[in-house]
Amino acid sequence: MTTTLQRRESANLWERFCNWVTSTDNRLYVGWFGVIMIPTLLAATICFVIAFIAAPPVDIDGIREPVSGSLLYGNNIITGAVVPSSNAIGLHFYPIWEAASLDEWLYNGGPYQLIIFHFLLGASCYMGRQWELSYRLGMRPWICVAYSAPLASAFAVFLIYPIGQGSFSDGMPLGISGTFNFMIVFQAEHNILMHPFHQLGVAGVFGGALFCAMHGSLVTSSLIRETTETESANYGYKFGQEEETYNIVAAHGYFGRLIFQYASFNNSRSLHFFLAAWRVVGVWFAALGISTMAFNLNGFNFNHSVIDAKGNVINTWADIINRANLGMEVMHERNAHNFPLDLASAESAPVAMIAPSING
């Protein structure tokens, strides 16, 4: 009897590429989402760096008054930004080949669209890559669900809000002072501080920070000491050890006595779910609030809600906020508007009640 051993034909180039892309043995997992993520994020990053350093001023309001945003045009790290594309462009897709020249493309803020479109696609693929790696490793898929909260926020300020307002010039500038300007104008036009979804977002972010500090301090304070008093307690932990590194019973007992028993978790899994869900749900609501205000479903308006017996207004803090909003609104885009929109849209007071009779 003769046994024949035949070497398996080597995989072709495409199969080797597929195996490399989906391999979990790589130092950094690539994945099929990564095939899109890497070039798009690289394009967005390179364009952002170049534009932040050297882009010429952009006619953001479409009234031939360019706004400088780059370092070489007089800005610093705090005041610098990639200025959003011009209001003259509106919501039109404005790639380089749509402009008559590179100078025109830069003047109308073309780099802003290039950056945000590549960034949003790359960031979305990053979320897909999180799911893909979890799937390959047999993990549950909740990491990408948590990441969806900041991703939804990015979509809200860079895409949904400009769509609702009718122009990418209303998108958030890519810089520190530009972000502050975006926030101030947003408050002036939409009263975001009085929107319940934004309030839930504040509770999510600040509450998440509080719970993170509480959890970290409780765990650090209830470590099971494996070292001497002269050594750091951190040396008592070995990566991959089977034993618990802190005493959850002690932490539960401490916190239950500090507040009350049922304020403390006695289940580590439900505790960590709560730590993740609180912040994620809060930021989801904040992104949803931005997306609703994009279409002018604004925050609560309690102006002139308290009056005396004679009908005179008794000012509340809501009226003070309203005056601040009007002040901010008249200050922004000074040369693009004669009046803030709230004043311009009010009913006009008639000067003459009836038309004069003309004899002759």
From Swiss-Prot:
C-terminally processed by CtpA; processing is essential to allow assembly of the oxygen-evolving complex and thus photosynthetic growth. The record marks 190 as: Stabilizes free radical intermediate. Its EC number is 1.10.3.9. GO terms for biological process: photosynthetic electron transport in photosystem II; response to herbicide. The chain crosses the membrane at residues 29-46, 118-133, 142-156, 197-218, 274-288. Pheophytin a binds at residues 126, 130, 147, 214. The record marks 344-345 as: Cleavage. The D1/D2 heterodimer binds P680, chlorophylls that are the primary electron donor of PSII, and subsequent electron acceptors. It shares a non-heme iron and each subunit binds pheophytin, quinone, additional chlorophylls, carotenoids and lipids. D1 provides most of the ligands for the Mn4-Ca-O5 cluster of the oxygen-evolving complex (OEC). There is also a Cl(-1) ion associated with D1 and D2, which is required for oxygen evolution. The PSII complex binds additional chlorophylls, carotenoids and specific lipids. Chlorophyll a ChlzD1 binds at residue 118. Residues 47-117, 157-196, 289-360 are lumenal. Chlorophyll a PD1 binds at residue 198. Its main location: membrane. Coiled coil: none annotated. Fe cation binds at residues 215, 272. GO terms for cellular component: photosystem II; plasma membrane-derived thylakoid membrane. [CaMn4O5] cluster binds at residues 170, 189, 332-333, 342, 344. Residues 345-360 form a propeptide. One of its GO terms (molecular function) is electron transporter, transferring electrons within the cyclic electron transport pathway of photosynthesis activity. It holds the Pfam family Photo_RC. Keywords: Calcium, Chlorophyll, Chromophore, Electron transport, Herbicide resistance, Iron, Magnesium, Manganese, Membrane, Metal-binding, Oxidoreductase, Photosynthesis, Photosystem II, Thylakoid, Transmembrane, Transmembrane helix, Transport. Residues 1-28, 134-141, 219-273 are cytoplasmic. HAMAP family: PSII_PsbA_D1 (MF_01379). Belongs to the reaction center PufL/M/PsbA/D family. 2 of the reaction center chlorophylls (ChlD1 and ChlD2) are entirely coordinated by water. Photosystem II (PSII) is a light-driven water:plastoquinone oxidoreductase that uses light energy to abstract electrons from H(2)O, generating O(2) and a proton gradient subsequently used for ATP formation. It consists of a core antenna complex that captures photons, and an electron transfer chain that converts photonic excitation into a charge separation. The D1/D2 (PsbA/PsbD) reaction center heterodimer binds P680, the primary electron donor of PSII as well as several subsequent electron acceptors. This is Photosystem II protein D1. It comes from Thermostichus vulcanus (Synechococcus vulcanus). The gene is psbA.
